[in-house]
């Protein structure tokens, strides 16, 4: 049951253990939410350019995905979410910051949104990239749990904590929501090595601060080059930047050129952004390698 990791999370964030569920990555938590609360024919709302897993887990359990039109800056349009709520709506996925756009919703807007959503609809707030945010932008979602029993917050150790290969994440919600999810969860879904590493990482604030600093520096490095080359990009609050090459053919040409030179970027056609690529922010030398081959093809 992950006793010691739950204890560490309780001490870190002033939570109770019955508010926490552990997952084989936060992806597991998202899937557990879908399997627990969605039945065949139920509707699930998420943004058009949101994390692909939302659609995958919705379809896997027989749910119907309802895509909300994004804002002009590709961010979540919460007013559109509200318009799409119907009698069949059972769950809403919101990523903040969002993948692959890197956009961020202001805390005040999320708080106002929560107050308008019917209480029987579960709201899953995916905060996998929260550790990359500046202190003034960081989530205060845990403080909303007392008022909103229909809120589930998912977090990950795969990003700023650097434990992606170990597969460890967690969800935080009301004890009622967590109890229902635990009935669906496989009893041994998280291995002991991942739990031990996660406990250690929770105590290593210096590493998180360093990771955020390096990420901030790398983001500025890449943004400067995109501005120089007049390449459109989405200002990002995560550890990646999505940039637009104008059309799908050109995006594929750049993708293949970079790949041949040992630089792996992400095609995001499946996010309905066919002319865009997403590049992860790396160390300075890694970013320089990307920049070198980006410029050599421009």
Segments from the language model and where they lie:
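PLP-dependent aminotransferase-like
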Residues: 7, 36-94
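Conserved PLP-binding catalytic core of the aspartate aminotransferase-like
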Residues: 72, 216, 228-261, 277, ...
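PLP-dependent aminotransferase class I/II
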Residues: 150-234
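Short acidic capping loops at alpha-helix termini that bridge into adjacent secondary structure
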Residues: 16-20, 40-43, 88, 120, ...
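Phosphate-binding glycine-rich loop
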Residues: 3-43
